[in-house]
């Protein structure tokens, strides 16, 4: 793991009296540098407080997020931008995701229509890369989080 990320985590732990060995994940959003930069900025500004992942595209040994987990959000260059804590996680079919969840994702005009348009494109591409077909009723992992640092 990058020393910058480790140092960022240790600084957070020291300032918040959290043991350094507390588990965390460091990751970026999306599938391009530009998307990672844009979405990390939305999280850092407190606008983006939710995300959606395709359950069927998780690696076999990859766990879904858990309530109480810490995440270091990285930009498109792998630089730490902020830290979040997971507040809720649920699995729901893509076509049943609510306008409230879409709003919390913080993207575009925050409407469900905008969210669906960009996520249809994103998930279609991600499924295609995995040689799978994206379907409207695909199970999705919805995560709500709070920026804490």
Model segments located where?
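Mixed-charge, low-complexity intrinsically disordered regions
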Residues: 1-83, 89-149
